[in-house]
Regions:
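Short, small-residue-biased leader/transition segments that mark boundaries at the very start
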Residues: 1-3
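C-terminal interaction-tip segments
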Residues: 102-126
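Solvent-exposed strand-to-loop "edge" motifs in beta-rich extracellular domains
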Residues: 34-39, 121-123
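Surface-exposed ligand/attachment interfaces on beta-rich extracellular proteins
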Residues: 7-26, 36-82, 91, 99-109
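Detector for the mature cores of small, proteolytically processed
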Residues: 85-86
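Hydrophobic residues on conserved beta-strands that form the core of alpha/beta folds
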Residues: 29-31
Length: 126
């Protein structure tokens, strides 16, 4: 599990991307889940979405950051087939989470906590 409070997403912009997890060499993520533990808030904020991406491929998208308790999940049968995939046999690979807001910049956030849960595995060395 990776948990991030509003500080990780603080930027004088409407979009920011952070590295939330680094796949090990021969790493696999079989399941992924985003959970809004505490709703994000800011004056004028009308929308806040989170997207989890690996190597430019969305595995979770349009997760609602304004609703406490919101859950977005994916497994091998969903997420465009990008879960259960070995990204590299020789290098680590980053899983990023992008926050995109409307109505307020991300540095105006006054509350919020997002949790990322991953079911991972690693192939043995050849």
């Amino acid at each position: 599990m990776c948990s991030s409070d509003l500080g990780a997403f603080s930027a004088a912009a409407n979009t920011i991307t952070i590295t939330a997890y680094t796949y090990p060499v021969r790493g696999i993520v079989n399941k992924a889940l985003l959970f809004t533990k505490t709703a994000f808030a800011a004056a004028g904020l009308t929308a806040l979405h989170f997207t989890a991406t690996v190597a430019g491929n969305d595995i979770l998208s349009l997760h609602n950051g304004l609703a406490a308790g919101a859950v977005t999940q994916a497994n091998e049968a969903s997420a465009g087939g990008y879960l259960g995939y070995v990204w590299s046999m020789s290098a680590t690979t980053a899983l990023t989470v992008t926050a995109t807001s409307a109505g307020a910049l991300l540095n105006a956030l006054t509350a919020g906590e997002l949790e990322l849960y991953l079911e991972t595995a690693q192939l043995p060395a050849p």
